[in-house]
Amino acid sequence: MKITKAEVEHVALLARLELTEQEAETFTGQMDAILAYVDKLNELDTDGIVPTAHAVPMENAFRADEVTPSIGIENALGNAPKRAESFFRVPKVIE
């Protein structure tokens, strides 16, 4: 697949990138080389190959949920500069 300078400039416009003429020329060559390499993959015989999402089996790496006591309101608010009952009091940020 051959990519043109106009296509590179169009993608740059969509990405809101300003490219110099030199950058557009450079990226056109680089993108063309990348797409040519990827196009080689189309030559591979993949019949009988099962599609996979991961190269290795994935397992859930999360720990089990455990109920533990919290630090409590007094400890949490102990060093708060201002508080209102059981809440942190912060300056108003919306006018």
UniProtKB/Swiss-Prot annotation:
Catalytic activity, EC: 6.3.5.-
Subunit and interaction comment: Heterotrimer of A, B and C subunits.
Protein role: Allows the formation of correctly charged Asn-tRNA(Asn) or Gln-tRNA(Gln) through the transamidation of misacylated Asp-tRNA(Asn) or Glu-tRNA(Gln) in organisms which lack either or both of asparaginyl-tRNA or glutaminyl-tRNA synthetases. The reaction takes place in the presence of glutamine and ATP through an activated phospho-Asp-tRNA(Asn) or phospho-Glu-tRNA(Gln).
Catalysed reaction equations from the record: L-glutamyl-tRNA(Gln) + L-glutamine + ATP + H2O = L-glutaminyl-tRNA(Gln) + L-glutamate + ADP + phosphate + H(+); L-aspartyl-tRNA(Asn) + L-glutamine + ATP + H2O = L-asparaginyl-tRNA(Asn) + L-glutamate + ADP + phosphate + 2 H(+)
Signal peptide: none
Keyword hit for Ligase: yes
Family (UniProt): Belongs to the GatC family.
Protein name, as recorded: Aspartyl/glutamyl-tRNA(Asn/Gln) amidotransferase subunit C
Keywords: ATP-binding, Ligase, Nucleotide-binding, Protein biosynthesis
Gene source species: Geotalea uraniireducens (strain Rf4)
Any GO molecular function: glutaminyl-tRNA synthase (glutamine-hydrolyzing) activity
Pfam families in the record: GatC
GO biological process, one term: regulation of translational fidelity
HAMAP family given in the database record: GatC (MF_00122)
